[in-house]
Amino acid sequence: MEDFVRQCFNPMIVELAEKAMKEYGEDLKIETNKFAAICTHLEVCFMYSDFHFINEQGESIIVEPEDPNALLKHRFEIIEGRDRTMAWTVVNSICNTTGAEKPKFLPDLYDYKENRFIEIGVTRREVHIYYLEKANKIKSEKTHIHIFSFTGEEMATKADYTLDEESRARIKTRLFTIRQEMASRGLWDSFRQSERGEETIEERFEITGTMRRLADQSLPPNFSCLENFRAYVDGFEPNGYIEGKLSQMSKEVNARIEPFLKTTPRPIRLPDGPPCFQRSKFLLMDSLKLSIEDPNHEGEGIPLYDAIKCMRTFFGWKEPSVVKPHGKGINPNYLLSWKQVLAELQDIESEEKIPRTKNMKKTSQLKWALGENMAPEKVDFDDCKDISDLKQYDSDEPELRSFSSWIQNEFNKACELTDSIWIELDEIGEDVAPIEHIASMRRNYFTAEVSHCRATEYIMKGVYINTALLNASCAAMDDFQLIPMISKCRTKEGRRKTNLYGFIVKGRSHLRNDTDVVNFVSMEFSLTDPRLEPHKWEKYCVLEIGDMLLRSAIGQVSRPMFLYVRTNGTSKIKMKWGMEMRRCLLQSLQQIESMIEAESSVKEKDMTKEFFENRSETWPIGESPKGVEEGSIGKVCRTLLAKSVFNSLYASPQLEGFSAESRKLLLIVQALRDNLEPGTFDLGGLYEAIEECLINDPWVLLNASWFNSFLTHALR
């Protein structure tokens, strides 16, 4: 093959091909087919440019070599064949003088008449396959693509072939001659089979046989074969077409596609009104734990036993009093409910054997708090369908609430590290395949970054509470069962620790359907004074129940201990998802993994170790009014986990709607940033759809606030 190349091609082309292979560290003695391919490509580029000039009137003309008029301007600038540095210098110079957009990859030519870069392709395979590979690689509508094959086929962007037919015929004839010469020497088959694609998934992918027949049969009317359809799709100009089609569909539809520019989007309007309130099923950053280390008491692991043991660690109990009343509730009933819990725990301790579960006495205060006998009586529809004024009961629109900074503080706290370990490394067994080894390594690195995270504590707390509540709802449907809110962890030194956050009293729970509600009263310990942010605690009645001694830099200080009490409700389906909160770990691990994969594909090796161990590198975490926030890879892991956990804790229809609708606006903005010139119709309708989800949910309002920060910085 090497001898053939040296005989068949101009010595200047051979020399340029040798230099190109040397520059890329390839041996032409071994890569002989590549040597031939580079020479062929160079020759086609030169032939494309040959004899084409621009006259004084700016028209493209063809001048044969013997013509003496040498003062004409060449129509094409040849970029292919130059060393990389020189080639980029030429490209930059062209961009500066013509205003053309700088391409991501080095093109082959620049056409001064059409003012565009050209990528020339020469393929031994089907032209449309190679064309798609080129288009996928370049990803730019500004660079014109023109593909030739050794069989005389060609394909170009928008079926615009740039050159006159005679010039293209000269190139096709030369390629056919090269093929014949190779075939006569027995070199063609090896050369044809050696072609590699543009490193895409479609490499060496040919549609043949049944699939080809089905493809031709599946085309829209008016298209005889797949190539024609591909050429049509490739040359399709959407502007104006979509509007026309829409107006055909309905007389009411009148969509004008408007260009989406940097000045087009406005911030999302957040609602006005009183500040939003805390609506999670349990306290987050404000919770307080009563803990025991190295538990080894009798009945260890039985929740009620553990709870009593934790309660005994605190000695500062005092007569409870209401410090922040609930606006609408009967606050003395909340106070009496806590006193009842204390009294019944006292009674248990005096018994000879502590029971495994505790059902509370059905006192008037608990009946009120749990909504006993408060549900309207259900009547069979057949018995009342003849009543003339039968209607669904009136329900008020939810009151609009404004964004409040406490939810940002909650999120920041969820991303922080605690001094405890909340998840253990899974024992999955020995790795067998290399992919398993990589997966284990990633899981171990990720676990190390998030095992101490407060969001992980929320996961374990949520799993425990939902599991215990669902079990009790099924096992003791009629009882007001007392359920301790417990979590387990390890200290930094590895000692086991059991924590008590407070108690839940469950109401009647005849849950037939997934959405049937069980009411419960939660009573949770805290050191947070509710009077500092009363709007956050709108749904709570807060009691002061004791004084806690805390170690500080100045010695021991006494702080009041509070009990946050509220009536709440949940359903079977919500508890089922709450029990599966560990999925949040998996979701955030997968997001981190996609970042590692992106890095690995660039470097062409697995980058897991470098990704986690390069402490000097920072990564984008999110947007804030100050701009893009960056942090260590550990911080990224914890932030992604916290987002996933908050999506679970604050799950709601408002969040579903906001996520789905704001994603559309996000994709449009991303397209604008990628210079894809997006167009939109009814942008006002999209904003309406987003803003109707902003009612009163704190997590949705925070996400909307973040989105506005993103819009500000993305469109600068």
Swiss-Prot record:
Motif Nuclear localization signal 2 (NLS2) mapped to chain: 184-247
UniProt xrefs under InterPro entries: INFV_PA, PA/PA-X, PA/PA-X_sf
Signal peptide: none
GO MF terms held by the record: endonuclease activity; metal ion binding; RNA binding
Cofactor: Mn(2+)
Subunit structure: Influenza RNA polymerase is composed of three subunits: PB1, PB2 and PA. Interacts (via C-terminus) with PB1 (via N-terminus).
Function according to Swiss-Prot or TrEMBL: Plays an essential role in viral RNA transcription and replication by forming the heterotrimeric polymerase complex together with PB1 and PB2 subunits. The complex transcribes viral mRNAs by using a unique mechanism called cap-snatching. It consists in the hijacking and cleavage of host capped pre-mRNAs. These short capped RNAs are then used as primers for viral mRNAs. The PB2 subunit is responsible for the binding of the 5' cap of cellular pre-mRNAs which are subsequently cleaved after 10-13 nucleotides by the PA subunit that carries the endonuclease activity.
Protein name listed in UniProt: Polymerase acidic protein
Lineage: Viruses, Riboviria, Orthornavirae, Negarnaviricota, Polyploviricotina
